[in-house]
Amino acid sequence: MTPLIFVTGGVVSSLGKGIAAASLASILEARGLKVTMMKLDPYINVDPGTMSPFQHGEVYVTDDGAETDLDLGHYERYVRTRLSRKNSVTTGRIYENVIRKERRGDYLGATVQVIPHITDEIRRCIDEATAGFDVALIEIGGTVGDIESLPFLEAIRQVRTERGAEKAMFMHLTLVPYIAAAGELKTKPTQHSVKELRSIGIQPDVLLCRSEQAVPDSERRKIALFTNVSERAVISCPDIDVLYGMPLELRRQGLDELVIDQFKLRDKVATADLSEWEAVVDAVKHPLDEVTIAVVGKYVDHQDAYKSVAEALKHGGLRQRTKVNLTWLEAQDLEGSDMAALQGIDGILVPGGFGDRGFEGKVQTSKYAREHKVPYFGICYGMQAAVVDYARHVADLDAANSTENDRQSPHPVIGLITEWRTATGEVEKRDEKSDLGGTMRLGLQEQRLKPGTLAREVYGKDVVAERHRHRYEFNNRYRTQLEDAGLVISGKSMDDTLVEMVELPRDTHPWFLACQAHPEFLSTPRDGHPLFIGFVRAAREKKAGGKLLKEARA
């Protein structure tokens, strides 16, 4: 039976439960344990796939095509375990499962209730996702006191009651605000948050105290006294300059030792080797170069909408000790402009998106990068914008467009995918009447790269696999016409039916590459990703006037 660490939050949301949990997981992994993570979200949506990026941030996609909370992105950036749809569960999915069972008659005529049926389903999902691991960390979304979270909290209370402290730990993240007028930290919100937890039968084993500054020992003792938590288990989590340094900070305070002692794992663990995280922090703090990248998107007012893109760009810089400064530009604002906002930029990235708002701004951005020889990296919608730009302005296909935005376009160079083969070999079919939720081409898909192309050079191999999330695709009827006009199709699906990557010849542009996949989902701070590393290097070369010293490379 896998030992479980349940991570809850109190006082306010957005304190960083996901980062804290992932940091602890990375330490346990560094000590030789097989670790997994899970997110329980209290919203009633079945998954975040149809939620607005302005409300929820990005939708993170796993290998098996699950559309999940962005916290799973944090998890995979900190631990080596690849997650799946089992690791992201919402209230909507729980109720959907229970109602389906009720309709089948699985409950044999019983009155279906929150307790035991909903809580039993939550526990079943937890068991399914965590089986076979040495330790599992499970984050409960929201804040203690929210009515939506109650079934999840009741379920984990039951788990602790049945399994005991050696198999279930409660870790509570709470706010210790600093009141500038008084010049002191206030522990009362934390006391009340723990009181709220205890009122529903949960006594925290560990408190993570988030604050602007380190919580002094005197305040830690006070918190321990009022919350019935060991002083050793009251951990200070102050703001830090480099988030990827959180594993080092938690290790310094012995959080992993608390877990190992409570779960009696001493004979299974080794000494923690956090040298990779030390190297990451050192690269962030001591860069040797600096570039400015413009991200031209549709949801830039909510930067969590592009969380993985922003992190992947930073990772690309880390691998070559380069600080990446991001300039966020709203695509719609560039429509009809003189593109002055892009002057002095070392590289341009156009990320994914949906709908016609801002699409013309993305097309103009691609045109600007192509004509001014600025390194360009298009992702998903960014690739489609690049194809439309090339079709209109190079291949002379007037009014070329995507059918997502103009169904009457005389040259629909981007169209709806109606049929494709999944990674498991199954054939998926869609039409314009299909539901929006869960109907895209999703998950890890292999593609073959064309020899001699930039894509092949950057990846260093012939076949690669990337995660996808798209409903529209390069229209195959225009392959020959656009290739004859000079566009290079550098990546195709393994069955040759879908265009995966396009680029410009190296003799016409130093670095112009666009992909239908979302490579940002496979980038990590310790390893980076070939496309982002190559893109940042191209930006460095542009800044250096095309001459980059070999010894300055990663």
From Swiss-Prot:
Binding-site residues, UTP: 13, 186-191, 222
SUPFAM superfamilies to which the protein is assigned, alphabetical: Class I glutamine amidotransferase-like (SSF52317), P-loop containing nucleoside triphosphate hydrolases (SSF52540)
GO molecular function annotation: ATP binding; CTP synthase activity; glutaminase activity; identical protein binding; metal ion binding
Binding site for ATP: 14-19, 71
PROSITE patterns for this protein: GATASE_TYPE_1
Record EC number: 6.3.4.2
Region (Amidoligase domain): 1-265
Residues engaged in binding CTP: 13, 146-148, 186-191, 222
GO CC, alphabetical: cytosol
Activity regulation statement: Allosterically activated by GTP, when glutamine is the substrate; GTP has no effect on the reaction when ammonia is the substrate. The allosteric effector GTP functions by stabilizing the protein conformation that binds the tetrahedral intermediate(s) formed during glutamine hydrolysis. Inhibited by the product CTP, via allosteric rather than competitive inhibition.
InterPro entries, sorted: Class_I_gatase-like, CTP_synthase, CTP_synthase_N, GATASE, GATase1_CTP_Synthase, P-loop_NTPase
Keyword Nucleotide-binding: yes
Top-rank taxon: Bacteria
Active-site feature positions: 380 (nucleophile), 518, 520
Keyword terms: ATP-binding, Glutamine amidotransferase, Ligase, Magnesium, Metal-binding, Nucleotide-binding, Pyrimidine biosynthesis
Catalytic reaction list: UTP + L-glutamine + ATP + H2O = CTP + L-glutamate + ADP + phosphate + 2 H(+); L-glutamine + H2O = L-glutamate + NH4(+); UTP + NH4(+) + ATP = CTP + ADP + phosphate + 2 H(+)
Residues where L-glutamine binds: 353, 381-384, 404, 471
Note: CTPSs have evolved a hybrid strategy for distinguishing between UTP and CTP. The overlapping regions of the product feedback inhibitory and substrate sites recognize a common feature in both compounds, the triphosphate moiety. To differentiate isosteric substrate and product pyrimidine rings, an additional pocket far from the expected kinase/ligase catalytic site, specifically recognizes the cytosine and ribose portions of the product inhibitor.
Family, as annotated: Belongs to the CTP synthase family.
Record note on quaternary structure: Homotetramer.
Name of the protein described by the UniProt record: CTP synthase
Gene expressing this chain: pyrG
